[in-house]
Amino acid sequence: LKLDITDYSALENLFLCEGFDVVCNLAAQAGVRYSIDHPRSYVENNVVGFFNILECCRYHCNTLVYASSSSVYGGNTKAPFCEDDKVDNPKSLYAATKKSNELMAHVYSSLYGIHTTGLRYFTVYGPWGRPDMSPVLFANAITEGRPIRLFNGGDMIRDFTYIDDIIRGTL
């Protein structure tokens, strides 16, 4: 089934037809750099689409697990991160949309009793990985004998999570 989460009628029809006990929302426009040039896509998919899912859960399902992002930690310099750390300084529109999801889920939980769990995934890698992510870019550069392009002078530190670990943790 292919469905656009910004299409509320189609989404609500799916909820009505399927009678979900739990919803796991992994739909989002991902990527920090892309959000700079395509902000509308992020607001429509990550905010409006998520709102539609919350509205459908409000009326048709009371449990929602959803993907947030490590990018909500923004300018937080403490390492390692903790789920109680402040997340009020996003550094990209993508991060702001994911923080918005967390706030919206909290409100729907408080107002309507929906059980919500947001999972702050760190960079996910593995088979079928996104072609714009560093593991794929680095592997392609190495196999093609090209130099690896680094950002921030190569001083960046990044946590990666293997897709199978994400699946186990989410389920």
Model regions and ranges:
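NAD(P)-dependent short-chain dehydrogenase/reductase
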Residues: K78-P80, L103-L171
